[in-house]
Amino acid sequence: EDNDTTATTLIALTHSTLADFNEYLDVLAISDNMLHDWGYSGTYQLASFHPNYVFDGSDVDDAENYTNRSPYPLLHLIREADITRYMKKEEDAEKIFSHNIEKARTLGCPYFEGVLDTLKKDKPAR
């Protein structure tokens, strides 16, 4: 909070329970509520990424889900001021989202499955 040069923070959720997407969604909701309760609504925003991410209303096998899939469950804490500053440079914020979905569908699920599998295999040395 005191360092305004840090625009974003990634939080990796490593507990095995959170491999379940529904459990992860519970943690996401709790985290979002905590931000609100602590008075950070409008200051920070949570973006969510999970290996089994499925958008509400989307089919499990729709490639659009890969726009929010990651090798591991993550919470992405972002300063809203930075989002606002970036979005002022964009003509239409919705275009970004639509473009990402279109690109994901063009590349297809097998492409993203391969990328995520490669990333999971490439673990850092201990």
Language model: regions and residue ranges:
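Expand to "…catalyze enediolate/carbanion chemistry for C-C bond making/breaking, isomerization
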Residues: 1-126
